[in-house]
């Protein structure tokens, strides 16, 4: 039929459409590009839209175009920060989300348009690393938002906490897929952030947001530093201009292992494998400068002006990389004298209760410290100078007092102890089990001299006239006859300790081994005698004194130089019929009876075996 139809036969086939590089770009509409940003004006939206359009057209660019586009993006980021200033305490939160959204758009366009014959923009090459930077900030700050509130007794609104948890879940989930396209996750995260701002604004209008919560939000979400983001970009642009680098060179940062290893069980719990935030990767050793105790930001919550001025997250008072003058600095060489606290009332970031002072001028400054509730006063004793010398943090939410003590090295600390002097008890860090952390608690007897060393410890610990017990450990001392005095089984006890000549260095713990000894060599092994039992939450009802550490006990048994071993044995009359050397038999048989500790029984059997095989002859 087509042959009989001349009009149909005369038609030519349609010409083929020649597809070029820029015609293949799928341009996104303005709502997709602009509507996901938070609190931007129409003029700023037009500027962002023009930058995105220029990014599409210059994806295959020259060196000059790349440098010019980097400067344009830098100006756009500064304008975004300027527009978000009216958010006050939520300024940093909104700025992080907007900048994350901007570079996520750059990355999404770069993934869609992959050119192989031209050089890409530097912002396109670095977009993945910049997204990683802002995404880690969101995860770190939201984690810190949940962690620091119970540490400072701050009650967060339930509605706001739910929406913040949704945002944290979205950020953690998308952090696992950083190598893939980020367009879908970008919109979900921005919607979750908008929901957080909507709930916070409604609660603030209803008067349910206290001034402490406002200051807390300003502290947790600091304003990002744009100079820190663009400084490596500008540096690379200068190297490209000088011929030292090319646009095809990618920005490579130091590799960091932040996600749990992939194993055969990963497919069963893939959604639980989250990127670990920075706040949970900090060191917790008391002797390091990166130590987190129980962070106290009560001073910042009372004064919101200081949080607004602090725009750098690495310079905050609770940052792990900064040390207060009150915290002793690590010494490069041996110093025989302990470091005493400074005279100024500057506190470390882990302390809330200041040490008591005998000066009348400093008592007036302690009035702003919040008082403990009545429930805590019935359980805890009155804090003395000795316990306040340690950095103390009071948690009204759990009615506990956690101690973060800056310990010196064991050698330096043991060198200041005189075993022949009086005894003084000191409290050591208490457990904080309600926050997911557990630290051993020790209350022990430390002998000090009556003159120089005692004065030295008074300056450092505040007198040392009272023995204090915290947690599930008790402390006491021994009199001249070796009888334990001052032992307690209560959970929180405090009683004065009189100065007596101590013949035993004793401490207590959850597992009661045999009795202790008074050898001066045990003091050098001072800290090694403290076992660590993480996660123990049971409080025993009875305690028995602990034996010294295993190396110290073996030295006594093998060297025969300890006074304790010499008191337990005496020479027996020689066997005239055999003519052998004099044998040593125990004098106090009641001391050789089987104890409740298997380790002590085994040590005694080893000692008896060596004594029977190779008896020692003494004059």
UniProtKB/Swiss-Prot annotation:
Gene Ontology MF terms in the entry: DNA binding
Regions of compositional bias (Polar residues) in chain numbering: 589-598
Stored InterPro entries: Herpes_TAF50
Any Pfam family hit: Herpes_TAF50
Keywords, sorted A to Z: Activator, DNA-binding, Early protein, Transcription, Transcription regulation
Gene Ontology BP terms: regulation of DNA-templated transcription
Disordered: annotated segments: 301-389, 563-603
Biased composition (Low complexity): 371-389, 567-582
Function: Transcription activation.
Family statement drawn from the similarity comment of this UniProt entry: Belongs to the herpesviridae TAF50 family.
UniProt-recorded name of the protein: Putative transcription activator BRLF1 homolog
Organism per entry: Alcelaphine herpesvirus 1 (strain C500)
Gene responsible for this protein: 50
């Amino acid at each position: 039929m087509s042959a009989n139809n001349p009009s149909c036969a005369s038609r030519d086939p349609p010409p083929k459409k020649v597809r070029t590089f820029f015609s293949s770009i799928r341009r996104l509409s303005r709502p997709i590009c602009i509507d996901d940003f938070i609190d931007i004006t129409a003029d700023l939206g037009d500027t962002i839209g023009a930058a995105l359009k220029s990014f599409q057209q210059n994806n295959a660019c020259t060196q000059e175009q790349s440098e010019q586009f980097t400067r344009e993006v830098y100006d756009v980021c500064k304008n975004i920060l300027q527009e978000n200033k009216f958010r006050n305490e939520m300024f940093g939160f909104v700025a992080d989300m907007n900048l994350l959204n901007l570079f996520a758009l750059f990355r999404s366009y770069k993934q869609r348009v992959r050119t192989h014959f031209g050089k890409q923009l530097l912002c396109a090459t670095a977009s993945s690393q910049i997204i990683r930077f802002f995404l880690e900030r969101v995860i770190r700050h939201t984690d810190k938002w949940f962690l620091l509130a119970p540490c400072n007794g701050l009650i967060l609104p339930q509605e706001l906490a739910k929406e913040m948890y949704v945002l944290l879940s979205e950020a953690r989930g998308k952090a696992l897929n950083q190598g893939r396209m980020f367009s879908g996750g970008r919109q979900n995260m921005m919607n979750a952030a908008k929901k957080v701002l909507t709930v916070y604004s409604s609660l603030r209008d209803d008067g349910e947001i206290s001034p402490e919560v406002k200051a807390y939000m300003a502290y947790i979400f600091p304003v990002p530093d744009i100079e820190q983001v663009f400084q490596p970009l500008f540096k690379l642009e200068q190297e490209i201009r000088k011929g030292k680098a090319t646009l095809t060179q990618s920005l490579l940062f130091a590799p960091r292992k932040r996600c749990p290893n992939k194993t055969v069980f990963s497919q069963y719990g893939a959604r639980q494998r989250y990127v670990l935030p920075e706040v949970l990767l900090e060191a917790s050793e008391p002797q390091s400068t990166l130590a987190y105790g129980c962070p106290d930001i009560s001073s910042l919550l009372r004064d919101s002006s200081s949080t607004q001025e602090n725009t750098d997250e690495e310079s905050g008072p609770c940052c792990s990389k900064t040390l207060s003058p009150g915290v002793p600095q690590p010494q490069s060489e041996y110093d025989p004298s302990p470091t005493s606290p400074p005279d100024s009332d500057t506190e470390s970031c882990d302390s809330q209760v200041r040490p008591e002072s005998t000066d009348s001028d400093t008592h007036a400054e302690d009035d702003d410290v919040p008082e403990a509730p009545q429930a805590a006063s019935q359980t805890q004793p009155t804090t003395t100078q000795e316990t306040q010398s340690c950095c103390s943090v009071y948690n009204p939410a759990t009615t506990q007092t956690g101690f973060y003590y800056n310990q010196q090295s064991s050698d330096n600390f043991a060198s200041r102890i005189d075993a022949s002097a009086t005894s003084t008890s000191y409290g050591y860090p208490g457990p904080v089990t309600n926050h997911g952390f557990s630290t051993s608690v020790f209350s022990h007897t430390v002998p000090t001299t009556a003159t120089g060393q005692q004065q030295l410890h008074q300056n450092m610990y505040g007198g040392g006239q009272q023995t204090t017990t915290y947690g599930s450990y008790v402390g006491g001392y021994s009199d001249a006859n070796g009888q334990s005095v001052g032992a307690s089984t209560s959970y929180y006890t405090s009683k004065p300790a009189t100065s007596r000549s101590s013949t035993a260095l004793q401490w207590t713990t959850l597992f009661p081994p045999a009795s202790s000894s008074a050898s001066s060599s045990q003091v050098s092994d001072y800290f090694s005698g403290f076992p660590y039992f993480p996660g123990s939450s049971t409080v025993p009802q009875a305690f028995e004194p602990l034996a010294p550490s295993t190396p110290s006990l073996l030295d006594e048994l093998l060297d025969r130089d300890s006074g304790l071993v010499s008191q337990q044995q005496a020479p027996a009359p020689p066997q005239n019929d055999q003519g052998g050397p004099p044998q040593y038999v125990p004098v106090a048989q009641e001391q050789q009876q089987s104890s409740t500790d298997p380790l002590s029984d085994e040590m005694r059997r080893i000692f008896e075996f060596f004594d029977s095989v190779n008896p020692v002859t003494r004059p």
